[in-house]
């Protein structure tokens, strides 16, 4: 259900992705011996929306509420729903293009430009 990835050969996270709150977007899970992706808090792992079972479950939730008469849904942080399937490093954004709304000092990468 989540985005899991093996560490690099040296044991570090699978890529250079950063959390919105700073630091790596990856947290180690000792039981699986893998990293899981969290774009926000480590206690909020990202769902793997590339998986059909996850998509189906979310559609079931939407149908549940639609049958109860809700008028719509608010989808928060939608730009974080899908990650690069190949988990490639984010390319550095040239310094002259950085600003606080695109690439603040805590995140010198252009967020998932290669999607």
Question: What is the predicted role of each segment?
Answer:
Residues 1-115:
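Alpha-amylase-like alpha-glycosidases and glucanotransferases acting on alpha-linked glucans and related
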